């Protein structure tokens, strides 16, 4: 799956990942500061598992 981040960069994963796991992949500081995610415009919990291509913003 391909995750498109707010800045336009893309991350590719072979398996499903939670929003918090992706945040840790980007930066430990980001993951610690995160309180939610926004997936395709919808606010979701950090434990939400992403299985398909989407746009992600860490909040």
Where are these regions (language model features)?
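A glycine- and charged-residue-rich anion-binding loop/surface
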Residues: 1-59
């Amino acid at each position: 799956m391909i995750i498109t981040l707010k800045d336009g960069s893309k991350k590719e994963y072979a398996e499903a990942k939670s929003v918090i796991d992706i945040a840790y992949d980007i930066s430990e500081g980001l993951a610690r500061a995160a309180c939610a995610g926004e997936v395709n415009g919808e606010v979701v919990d950090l434990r939400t598992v992403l299985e398909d291509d989407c746009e992600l913003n860490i909040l």
